[in-house]
């Protein structure tokens, strides 16, 4: 942003499960304001991602639930987007605006951007509410955008992983969330072919 050269290794953490992470920190929250006057501000992340792309099979960018400049940067940097949405009223309500933003980025900034699909998360199918939300997502978006068959269930074990600094596969490898992520990965890879 300030034209300083950034080392391609700066901030990357190597995890024992053969995954590299570039975690966000508190300074990232001020970045949105700083980016306001930067030329080609939508392309900042793309420059970095393009520089490291050849080192990885896949690069996943996990964005905050916001349509700010960091999310726009992530969309410009990406080949495709998987839209996670909690099985609750307010997140589903914001889905239309997110899809509109994705399509605008595709039209103006990243023509190759594709929507992989919508992933329902924090789903508790024991409740009528979650079943209703899932049904509403399928009805509203299913004809235009794939809604993944696999969903990520509500689970305390999933919430515990952040505090422990472990993946769900190390924390609770035989649990329903680990199984759901494994199945989702297979579904996404199958769709890629």
Predicted feature locations:
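P-loop NTP-binding core
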Residues: 1-193
């Amino acid at each position: 942003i300030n034209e300083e050269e950034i080392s391609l290794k700066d901030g990357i953490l190597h995890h024992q499960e053969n995954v590299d992470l570039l975690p966000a920190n508190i300074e990232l929250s001020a970045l949105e304001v700083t980016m306001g006057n930067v030329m080609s501000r939508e392309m900042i992340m793309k420059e970095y991602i393009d520089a490291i792309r050849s080192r990885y099979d896949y690069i996943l960018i996990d964005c905050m639930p916001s349509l700010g400049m960091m999310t726009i940067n992530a969309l410009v940097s990406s080949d495709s987007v998987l839209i996670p949405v909690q099985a609750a009223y307010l997140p589903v309500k914001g889905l239309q605006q997110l899809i509109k933003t994705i399509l605008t980025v595709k039209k103006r900034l990243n023509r190759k951007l594709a929507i992989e699909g919508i992933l329902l998360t924090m789903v508790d199918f024991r409740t009528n509410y979650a079943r209703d939300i899932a049904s509403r997502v399928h009805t509203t978006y299913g004809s235009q955008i794939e809604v993944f068959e696999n969903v990520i269930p509500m689970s305390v074990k999933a919430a515990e992983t952040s505090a422990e600094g472990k993946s769900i596969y190390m924390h609770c490898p035989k649990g329903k969330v680990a199984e759901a992520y494994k199945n989702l990965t297979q579904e996404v890879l199958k769709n890629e072919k």
